[in-house]
Amino acid sequence: MTRSYKDIAQFTAGSHISRIQQSADGPAFRFYATEQFLVDDWQSAFVSAEKEQWVKTHQDVVLAQKGDVVISLIHGKAVRVSTENAGRILGNNYVKVDVDDSQINAAWFLWHFNESPEGRRQRIQTTQGSTVVQRIAVNELKNFTVTLPSLAQQKAMGGLYLAAREKRFYQQRIAALSEQQILSLLSGMI
């Protein structure tokens, strides 16, 4: 069955960071930035706390919660927010996706958006901007179409997709650590 994204999910654009009004006595929030996105996408293991930006505000802002599906409009990828990155402000380069669990599995949505030929084709067709900075428009995103398999099949595929991403991350991490160890041993031989 073919459906549009807007029929199976709700999309909430991130907060406009420049429009957040700061208040000295407001609760403090950190921002969900590229570093956090890459960690949630199994591409990085390190986040530099030195670069962290904080804001204190009483204003309503869009916060990422553990397990949320978030799409980076700049990277053109979807991730699931980790425990470590929960409670951060999503800026306007991100869109929070609340999938209808009765129709679609969140992990399968990640696979469909990131990896499926159907999702890739639509991302390429709707990307706007120069070759330097490309961006997906939220309204275009809502009109993406998806061919839905059964929920059981979605759960199986989504689980395999997440397991494969995690496995690849740890394999690359082990390879990098092994290379570091070998280079360190070689340096010690001189």
Report residues per predicted region.
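A short beta-sheet element
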Residues: 73-113
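Sequence-specific dsDNA recognition surfaces
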Residues: 6-20, 36-66
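Short, surface-exposed loop/turn microsegments at beta-strand edges and helix-strand junctions
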Residues: 21-29, 48-49, 62-64, 81-93
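Generic structural signal for buried aliphatic residues
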Residues: 68-71
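Compositionally biased, charged N-terminal/linker segments
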Residues: 25-40
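Alpha-helical membrane-embedding segments
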Residues: 62, 84-90, 124-129, 168-171
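Basic, amphipathic alpha-helical recognition segments used for DNA target recognition
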Residues: 5, 96-147
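Non-catalytic DNA-recognition/assembly elements of restriction-modification systems
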Residues: 1-28, 148-190
